[in-house]
Amino acid sequence: MTLVVSSLSALDLKLSKKMNDEKFVKLSGSGIIAELKKARIQVVAALPDIVTSDGLLWPISKNSDFRLIRVCKEDEGVSICAALSYTGTRALLLMQQTGLLDSLNSIRAIAMEYQQPVCMMIGLQGKNPAEKIADAENYSVRIVKPILQLMGLKTVIIENEKDISKIAASISYAYEFEQPVCFLLGSPPKADGDEYD
């Protein structure tokens, strides 16, 4: 048992050193929310997840500019976002990559084959902010981008503050050309008042 504990401690130290040695950026939750407002998103369908809850989901739930729809499964959110587009309402589905992987059939049918402007923002649970998505140790993180590319789904990587400025234009493109878009968040968005090194 001691061997396992010491191995875990060594792994924790290795990850801690890697994160301290490499410069990485925490994303601004308020910056992302400002882009969603700029894109005229009115509804956010979401399940709570560990990656986006503090910096996005909770602030969105308290913001009167958005209506939050809590869904039980991510594929419900795909249908809701697609249906809202018929009313002229712009929506965003907020989830983590495990929910995305679980919803691929709905995304394939509703978003891709029926060409619906389903906009999805994906928190990558288990991704070290210092690593690239393609190099992630977590298997479910590593396979997300290639799967989305294989499907032909427009994918936007959000790794830093400069990338955040791509959100509004990508959402507008999705609604103008009736195509889905998926944003992959390279690190957990920080809530206002959070301090990072």
Regions picked out by a protein language model, each given a short descriptive name:
Residues 11-197:
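Thiamine diphosphate
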Residues 4-5, 10-12:
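Acidic, Ala/Val/Gly-enriched low-complexity intrinsically disordered segments
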